[in-house]
Structures are given as structure tokens and as C-alpha cells.
């Protein structure tokens, strides 16, 4: 790995130099183990601890196939799908790997007793397989996480509709929380030149997801002047939705859970903010019954912030806890666009408020290549900024995942892989200087209370 890192850090390395590098037989990777999928049996979701299930293992470098690339990973980040993988909820990801392994002789590589996780990366191309023409060894890249086969016609208008669509590092193996990653070449995009490795790795999954969900015609199709209710507006996903709303001329109504998260939203430029804890919203009376009076109180508060208007779009991702309220507060003809369901997948709402008011529920999942490319282009132009708040080493990935699981983080949590320290990889100092305050906004925010314990990673 030292040879690879030296080449990346050298100012003089050429594509030929990278092509001449020998690929190691093995690399370090963050994994979960197939024989441990029942380790949290009987525990509540909250009590399942990623620090116990995530391992840092030495694993063999996978075979490189047609249309693929091996990438030296300088940095990655933690998403909720890595948390779900680590706690084996809502199911073990080894079922995904088994099914993928049955697709072809080549995909058998993915069906292993360990799963290398992670759906973000920033790094450098080391090798490309047959049929790859757009990317070459030495290219500095980021990767989006959509893996598709595109052998069916279904995916050719929108690749997210490909029957063999999968999320890399979640439903496939050889993900980005590692020193080397295996990706399809059509996952690659240019690394934003003004960002460090860890900053460039942070937007990836959540930035592309927010773009499709809120901006794209495949999602809510936000337009200028729209009132957009954003749950978790300072979090990993919501922070990008807030930025897209502001950049696109919409009016974000940011829902947060603390004063410091409200302050982050203000610093991003938002004016309408609801601290749901401070204002005491409790949308459920008990485990089985929601409280419509709280929906009405919430809707009244929104109208106070918008000059009497209801919201055109609700950016939904908490799921069960908030979905009834989301449907209620949306204006007639408005859109609830939903993904993830981090508080529970079984949504309940009063259908009278949907059907009689002609509202729409739109499901949104990640992004196609074009949407991911456009989202990354906005980052590269300095229009949208990373929301990186904290960076861990590869050895500390378990703690990073724990912090995300317990909501002890702001924005995105980064992980250094091959990068020996933070701040490396910046190529455009002038653009960086123009946007340095926005780039560091989440880094400067005070950390939530956290508790560190020993673990495997």
C-alpha cells in the first residue's frame, strides 16, 4: 500500500506510473461476518451496537471484471445503510449477496462469508477492466453507489428502475470502507478539486439521494417559491435537502431536535426553523395511536412561519414517527416524497387527508447516474457543500457507525482509509478559499454528547 500512497501523494505521478503499480494481494476492509448475524437477537434496535459487529479485516483483492474499476480509497463516510448492515436490520445483507452471487459466474465473487461495507468513496483509479474507456489509472474520483446491469429494457429511461439495480457496499460486496474498492466504471465521477479527500467522500450517497428526492422530475420536482418541510434538516440527508432548497429558490422549513442543530440551519441560510423537542411535539399518544391534535398544532406552527401557507413538499425520511403528520400538513395537491424510514417502515396516516386533498406520495430511492452526476457537479462548482462534521480512522469505523446509529452526529461522519491525515487532496485552492466557511460549517459546530467504548473497530 505504501507504493500506492506514495504515487497518489506525488505531484509527478502519471497515468503510466499508476498503471505500472503492482496491486497487493490483500487489503484492509471494514466487514461484518456471516456467522454473527444473530449476535443481537433479542435486543432492541437502539441497543444493537455496531462497535461489536464491525471488524477490520485483511481480505483478498477481488478479481477485476469487464466494465469495472479498482479504486484506491483515500476516504469514505458512514451512511445509515452501513448502520443497518452492522445491526442486521431490517435483515442481514448476506441475503443480498447470496442472490447477487447467483446472477453470473462473475458475481459469485460477492457471495462471501464476510461483507465489505460502505457506499461512499474518494480515491484514485488503480486498474480498469475490459471495456472501460472513460476512466484511467491515476484519475481522482468519487463514486456514487448505484450498481446496475442494464440487460433489461426497464432501466433505460431511468436506471433506478433496472430490475438488477443494487446499492454498492450494501447489496453488493467490496464497498468503500476499505483501502481498495471494486466499482462499476459508471459509478465513477470526477473528484471536486477544491475539496480534501474526506470532504469529497462525504456528499456521495446523501447528496445524490437528496437531489433526486427533492429536485429531480423523478422526485418532488421542486421549483422556485415552494415551501419545503425538511425533517432532520441538519442531518446527513436533510442538510443537503436544505442546501438544494436554498440554492433553488425554495423556502425550507427546517425541523430539528436541538438548539445547536437549529443554529446550523441558520448558518446555512434557513430562516424558518422548528425545534420539535423544544416545542414539545409528540405525534403518537402511545405505541399504537397517533395524535391528530398534534398534527394540527404542527400545521399551525408551519403557517406561522410561512405567512399562512401550507407546505408544497415534505422531504420525508424518518418514516413511521412523522409520516402521519407529514401527510396532514401538506397543502392540497402537494407532494410527500419519502425514502429510508429511519424510525420505522410501517407508516400510518389518515387517508382522508391524502385522497380528498389530491396529495401525492412519491417513493424515492438513491439516484440514477445522471442525477448523481448533476449533484456532484453542483458540489464541484461550489454551489453545494459537504456537511462533514467529524472524521475517524478506518480502525474507528465502529464508533463512527455507533454515533450515526445513536444520532450523536451532525451532518456526515467521515472515515480516512489510505489518507494518512485530514486535509490532503486539495487541487484548487482558489475555489476552496472562496467557500471555506461553508465547507467548514459543520466542522465548526459543537459535537453532541457522545460515549466511547471499546469495540472491534
PLM regions with names:
Residues 2-22, 324-327, 369-457:
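C-terminal hydrophobic helical "lid"/dimerization subdomain
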Residues 4-22, 37-75, 114-116, 131-132:
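A short N-terminal beta-strand-loop micro-motif at the entrance of redox/enzyme domains
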Residues 60-77, 91-152:
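Glycine-rich beta-strand-centered segment in the early N-terminal region that forms part
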Residues 107-113, 119, 146-232:
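NAD(P)H dinucleotide-binding glycine-rich loop of Rossmann-like/cofactor-binding domains
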Residues 209, 236-237, 321-322:
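Hydrophobic/small residue at the entry helix of a nucleotide-binding pocket
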Residues 223, 330-331:
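Helix-to-beta-strand junctions that scaffold the AdoMet/dcAdoMet cofactor pocket
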Residues 230, 246-321:
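Adenosine-nucleotide cofactor-binding segment
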Residues 341-356:
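Rossmann-fold NAD(P)-binding glycine/threonine-rich loop
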Amino acid at each position: 500500500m505504501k507504493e500506492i500512497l506514495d504515487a497518489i501523494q506525488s505531484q509527478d505521478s502519471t497515468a503510466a506510473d499508476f498503471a505500472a503499480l503492482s496491486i497487493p494481494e490483500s487489503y484492509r476492509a471494514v466487514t461484518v461476518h456471516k456467522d454473527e448475524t444473530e449476535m443481537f437477537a433479542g435486543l432492541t434496535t437502539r441497543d444493537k451496537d455496531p462497535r461489536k459487529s464491525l471488524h477490520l479485516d485483511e481480505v483478498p483483492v477481488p478479481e477485476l471484471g469487464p466494465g469495472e474499476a479498482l479504486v484506491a480509497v483515500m476516504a469514505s463516510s458512514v451512511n445509515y445503510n452501513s448502520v443497518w448492515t452492522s445491526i442486521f436490520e431490517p435483515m442481514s445483507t448476506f441475503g443480498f449477496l447470496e442472490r447477487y452471487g447467483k446472477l453470473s459466474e462473475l458475481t459469485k465473487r460477492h457471495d462471501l462469508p464476510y461483507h465489505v461495507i460502505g457506499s461512499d468513496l474518494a480515491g484514485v483509479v488503480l486498474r480498469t477492466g475490459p471495456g472501460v474507456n472513460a476512466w484511467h489509472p491515476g484519475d481522482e474520483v468519487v463514486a456514487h453507489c448505484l450498481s446496475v446491469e442494464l440487460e433489461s429494457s426497464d432501466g433505460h429511461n431511468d436506471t433506478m428502475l433496472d430490475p438488477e439495480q443494487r446499492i454498492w457496499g450494501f447489496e453488493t460486496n467490496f464497498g468503500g470502507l476499505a483501502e481498495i474498492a471494486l466499482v462499476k466504471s459508471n459509478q465513477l465521477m470526477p473528484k471536486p478539486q477544491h475539496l480534501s479527500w474526506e470532504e469529497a467522500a462525504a456528499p456521495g450517497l446523501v447528496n445524490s439521494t437528496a437531489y433526486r428526492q427533492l429536485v429531480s422530475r423523478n422526485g418532488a420536482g421542486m421549483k422556485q417559491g415552494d415551501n419545503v418541510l425538511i425533517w432532520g434538516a441538519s442531518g446527513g440527508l436533510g442538510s443537503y435537502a436544505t442546501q438544494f432548497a436554498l440554492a433553488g429558490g425554495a423556502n425550507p422549513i427546517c425541523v430539528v431536535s436541538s438548539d445547536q442543530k437549529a443554529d446550523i440551519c441558520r448558518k446555512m441560510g434557513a430562516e424558518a426553523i422548528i425545534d420539535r423537542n423544544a416545542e414539545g411535539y409528540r405525534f403518537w399518544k402511545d405505541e399504537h395511536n397517533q395524535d391528530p391534535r398534534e398534527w394540527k398544532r404542527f400545521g399551525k406552527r408551519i403557517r406561522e412561519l410561512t405567512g399562512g401557507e401550507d407546505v408544497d413538499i415534505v422531504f420525508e425520511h424518518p418514516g413511521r414517527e412523522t409520516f402521519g403528520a407529514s401527510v396532514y400538513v401538506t397543502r392540497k395537491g402537494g407532494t410527500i416524497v419519502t425514502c429510508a424510514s429511519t424510525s420505522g417502515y410501517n407508516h400510518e396516516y389518515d387517508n382522508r387527508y391524502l385522497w380528498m386533498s389530491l396529495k401525492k406520495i412519491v417513493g424515492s430511492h438513491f439516484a440514477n447516474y445522471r442525477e448523481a452526476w448533476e449533484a456532484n457537479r453542483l458540489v464541484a462548482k461550489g454551489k453545494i457543500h459537504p456537511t462533514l462534521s467529524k472524521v475517524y480512522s478506518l480502525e474507528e469505523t465502529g464508533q463512527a457507525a455507533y454515533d450515526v446509529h445513536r444520532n450523536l452526529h451532525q451532518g456526515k461522519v467521515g472515515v480516512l482509509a489510505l489518507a494518512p491525515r485530514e486535509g490532503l487532496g486539495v487541487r484548487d485552492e482558489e475555489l476552496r478559499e472562496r467557500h471555506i466557511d461553508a465547507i467548514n460549517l459543520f466542522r465548526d459546530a459543537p459535537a453532541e454528547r457522545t460515549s466511547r467504548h471499546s469495540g472491534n473497530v
